[in-house]
Structures are given as structure tokens and as C-alpha cells.
Amino acid sequence: LDSGVLGRLCAPVVERELEIWVVGLLQRGRKVLIPEVCDYEIRRELIRNRSASIAQLDGLAKTFEYLPITTPAIRRASELWAILRQTGVPTAPDDSLDADCVLAGQALVAAEAENRSVVVATSNVGHLVRMVDARVWQEIA
């Protein structure tokens, strides 16, 4: 899950379509992962806004599998960050951490570790699709 989808799952009232979609994935035995970088992006805003949704985010981390940031993932993210700039299509300013690169690095390393394909569920494929298989969440079954 990218931060857009994860954030919507943390809303006080989760959209019914999104809830049905994620429950369906779990029922079909699909892994639903919360990348640590996305947890960070959502959690910092929830803390800043003093939101009660932090408990919901913590609950999701218990329901879904948590994907920690690892050294191989950060190294892959660094490669992606550099390649995007070398080819003239950066996804964030040069002084930015660029969470999309970190998320893509996490996804690629997870795919290699498990020897299976990984699809990032997002609400905006624009940046992510340059680095990893990313699809609008409604298109993932």
C-alpha cells in the first residue's frame, strides 16, 4: 500500500469500496504490506494533527504485514533516485528524501526476497510506475 491508500484506510470512516477491496485481498490469501516509509508519512501527519486515527494505523499494522526499511531497500532506493535524475525525470526535489524511491526500493527488494511479483497499490501511479509495478488500487484483484 502506498501512503495515499494507507491514509484512506486510517480515516475515521473508511470508504466502503476500499474496505471491501482490502478484505477481498485478504480473503484471497494476498499479502497486504505496510511499507515503513508509508507508515512514517501517515503517522507524522496524524501526530501533527493530534488525530485519534493513530490507533487505526497501529491496528492496520497488526492486521497487515509490516515491511521494514532495510539496508538493501535503502540502497536500491538510492540507485532509483540517481537513475531518475540521470534520465531527467526526478520524482521530487534533489534535497528531498523522495519517499516514492524508498517505497519502490522496498517493493523491489521484497519481490526479490520472496521470488514473486509485487504490485504497489496506489491512488496515483504517476511517479511510482517509473520504478515499480504500481496500479490504482481498484485495478488490483
Segments the model singles out, each with a brief description of its role:
Residues 6, 39-42, 74, 128:
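A generic structural signal for short hydrophobic patches within well-formed alpha-helices
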Residues 62-67, 128-135:
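Short, mixed-charge aromatic SLiMs
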Residues 1-34, 44-64, 116:
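Short, well-structured N-terminal submotif of metal-dependent ribonuclease cores
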Residues 24-25, 60, 84, 110, ...:
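Hydrophobic helix-cap positions at the C-terminus of alpha-helices
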Residues 1-2, 34-35, 96-97, 121-125, ...:
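Histidine- and aromatic-rich ligand-binding microenvironments
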Residues 49-53, 84-85, 138-139:
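Short, hinge-like loop/turn segments at secondary-structure boundaries
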Residues 12-13, 46-47, 80, 131-135:
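Short aromatic-enriched loop/helix-cap "lid" or pocket-rim segments at secondary-structure transitions
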Residues 65-123:
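Active-site neighborhoods of divalent-metal-dependent phosphate/nucleic-acid chemistry enzymes
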